[in-house]
């Protein structure tokens, strides 16, 4: 078991140790890992304050000077308050800035609907050049950070709070964690952890489980080869039904004329 945010910060710290031209901007957002990062890199770790648009503007300027930039913010605020800056500054110019979102979905539900983040995947998937990740264990956190650092352009990484199970066979894009017979569950991020707690029941019912880390660009062919083995698949996550990644999968199934039935939950 590992804390997902601690894992993300651990690999950001390792990346910043290796890449001296990297910076970390916090939008008045803290965590245990952030405190460690501040002590290690006091000159490269900046708290911008509650100013999402300014943070993206500053990150863009740093990226234009060939810096690698991480921006840490609450999910619901970063994409709603700074959408224009993300779209025009980061995406249109394909700048190397990684947005680390804290509290996607209903993670901060006790704080009320202002903190719900139920359409972030839909928003970021629609942006050009943007890579989207939803890691679910230590290995996929490492893969997400590494993939961003070693490629061009912006990225968005969802990070939920809490401890998560580890999966030895996790890969960057699509992982067939558990093989089933007729029915398949497809999910990502936090929900992989929920179903991991019910592995014995899934095995008993012969229900397969696919975990997705990299949502965009998506490995269509890999999932298609898995879907061909199942009669029914169920996509489950914490998005609005009309803003779900499941809509993309539905379109994919119909475009490829697969016989697999899909239901979005």
Identify the residue ranges that each predicted region occupies.
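Thiamine diphosphate
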Residues: 1-163, ...
């Amino acid at each position: 078991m590992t804390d997902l945010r601690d894992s993300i910060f651990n690999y950001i710290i390792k990346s910043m140790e290796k890449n001296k031209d990297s910076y970390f901007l916090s939008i008045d957002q803290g965590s245990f890992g952030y405190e460690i990062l501040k002590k290690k890199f006091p000159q490269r770790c900046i708290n911008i304050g509650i100013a999402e648009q300014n943070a993206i503007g500053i990150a863009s300027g740093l990226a234009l000077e060939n810096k690698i930039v991480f921006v840490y913010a609450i999910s619901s605020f970063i994409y709603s308050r700074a959408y224009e800056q993300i779209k025009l500054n980061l995406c249109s110019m394909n700048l190397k800035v990684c947005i680390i979102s804290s509290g996607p979905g209903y993670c901060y539900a006790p704080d009320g609907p202002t903190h719900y983040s139920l359409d972030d995947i839909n928003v970021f998937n629609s942006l050009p050049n943007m890579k989207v990740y939803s890691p679910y264990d230590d290995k996929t956190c490492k893969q997400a950070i590494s993939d961003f650092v070693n490629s061009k352009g912006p990225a968005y990484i969802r990070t939920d709070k809490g401890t998560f199970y580890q999966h030895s066979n996790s890969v960057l894009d699509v992982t067939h964690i558990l093989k089933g017979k007729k029915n398949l569950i497809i999910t990502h991020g936090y929900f992989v952890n929920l179903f991991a707690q019910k592995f014995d029941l899934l095995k008993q019912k012969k229900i397969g489980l696919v975990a997705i880390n990299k949502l965009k660009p998506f490995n269509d062919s890999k999932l298609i080869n898995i879907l061909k083995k199942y009669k029914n698949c169920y996509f489950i996550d914490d998005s609005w039904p009309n803003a779900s990644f499941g809509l993309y999968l539905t379109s994919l199934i119909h475009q490829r004329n697969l016989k697999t039935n899909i239901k979005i939950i």
